[in-house]
């Protein structure tokens, strides 16, 4: 059990890496992560640098669960996956989309909007509309969802979503975290319905992300009726087991998304998606396509709009008695790729210290 693993034991089988991004994403150009090997396989510890020990503790718990306890048994062998569009100009949209496979096979696209530092609200919105318009032109069959990361005020969100709904048309699936905070999100959802902002006579659907993963009470969104669905990410929620429980208790549809993980970390997201009883939306688990290179020989990059679940039994095998129930595992990192992307000594020391601090916060131990 991961609870019995002490920091010294964990760090004996841990490696730190930095993966260059093809395009800046949420301000990140080099994604740093710590890979952890345990009795059941591999896990990942990769909270963003600005996160403190308390917030990072959940990420450590998720990584230890994967490495010490495994990822569980899947209900499905492949996961539909959306493309992810950073806040790029229209001229770069096609190049980014093609990293996710053949354009006609892409089932959905998540489009970043409300990017900080790009001018006034009006200037930012104009760029967002141009980006969405180009995505719709290139992949007319794909569902479109926008993600503002809570970057708008309520009035800005009302204006922006009205304009975006007009551009996206019936392809518009939902808006993810348009405003920060649970109460504000609930008020926005109510006001959008009152104003009739929506698609084909239906209110625009709202998805909660930060209001779930950064909240002390991740179920408050559901109780307040603040969202139509939730976006769940395994690392900040503390692992697959806890994320499954949150989805079940919320009673809402869920979209499983990544936290800009390497293919090792993405495996936990795939495991969650594979274990959910229902999966009505394509998941945001194709983000390995945003890296220049990964830590595994065969990165988890979608083909034909889907990702296979690592370790899952092929369809029909278990029913025919040809295979035992599959246990999902993360792909093993390549030693040569890990060495090629290994962080310098000072950054490695910083990560090792950070793991100890997160472990202390996780276990409540008096001394590490």
PLM regions and their residue ranges:
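Flexible C-terminal active-site loop/helix
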Residues: 1-15, 19-31, 42, 46, ...
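Active-site mouth loops of central-metabolism enzymes
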Residues: 17-30, 78-94, 113-123, 150-155, ...
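Conserved N-terminal beta1-alpha1 strand-loop-helix module at the mouth
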Residues: 22-79, 129
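Solvent-exposed alpha-helices and their adjacent loops that cap or buttress functional pockets
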Residues: 27-28, 73-75, 100-103, 137-138, ...
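Electropositive phosphate-/nucleotide-binding environments in soluble metabolic enzymes
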Residues: 28, 50-58, 87-90, 122-125, ...
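Catalytic domains of carbohydrate-active enzymes, especially glycoside hydrolases
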Residues: 42-45, 96-117
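Catalytic core of soluble alpha/beta enzymes
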Residues: 111, 116-271, 293-295
């Amino acid at each position: 059990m991961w609870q019995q693993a002490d920091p010294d034991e964990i760090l004996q089988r841990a490696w730190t890496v930095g993966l260059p991004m093809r395009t800046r994403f949420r301000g990140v150009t080099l994604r740093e992560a710590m890979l952890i090997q345990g009795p059941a396989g591999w896990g990942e510890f990769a909270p963003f640098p600005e996160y403190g020990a308390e917030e990072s503790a959940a990420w450590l718990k998720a990584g230890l669960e994967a490495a010490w306890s495994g990822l569980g048994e899947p209900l499905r062998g492949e996961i539909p996956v959306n493309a992810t569009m950073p806040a790029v100009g229209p001229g770069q949209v096609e190049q980014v989309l093609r990293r996710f496979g053949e354009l006609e096979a892409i089932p959905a696209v998540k489009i970043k909007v409300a990017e900080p530092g790009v001018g006034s609200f009006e200037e930012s919105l104009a760029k967002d509309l141009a980006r969405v318009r180009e995505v719709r032109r290139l992949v007319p069959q794909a569902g479109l969802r926008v993600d503002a990361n809570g970057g708008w005020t309520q009035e800005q969100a009302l204006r922006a979503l009205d304009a975006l709904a007009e551009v996206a048309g019936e392809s518009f699936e939902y808006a993810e975290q348009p405003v920060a905070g649970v109460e504000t999100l609930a008020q926005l959802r109510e006001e959008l319905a009152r104003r009739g902002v929506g698609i084909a006579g239906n209110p625009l659907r709202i998805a909660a992300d930060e209001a779930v993963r950064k909240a002390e009470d991740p179920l408050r969104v559901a109780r307040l009726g603040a969202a139509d669905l939730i976006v769940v990410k395994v690392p900040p929620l503390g692992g697959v087991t806890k994320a499954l429980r949150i989805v079940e208790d919320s009673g809402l549809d869920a979209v499983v998304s990544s936290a800009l993980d390497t293919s090792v970390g993405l495996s936990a997201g795939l495991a969650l998606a594979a274990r959910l009883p229902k999966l009505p939306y394509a998941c945001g688990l194709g983000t390995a396509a945003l890296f220049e290179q990964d830590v595994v020989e065969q990165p988890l990059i979608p083909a034909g709009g889907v990702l296979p679940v690592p370790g899952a039994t092929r369809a029909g095998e278990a029913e025919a008695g040809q295979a035992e129930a599959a246990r999902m595992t993360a792909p093993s990192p390549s030693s040569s790729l890990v060495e090629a992307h290994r962080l310098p000594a000072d950054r490695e020391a910083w990560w090792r210290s950070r793991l100890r601090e997160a472990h202390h916060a996780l276990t409540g131990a008096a001394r590490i």
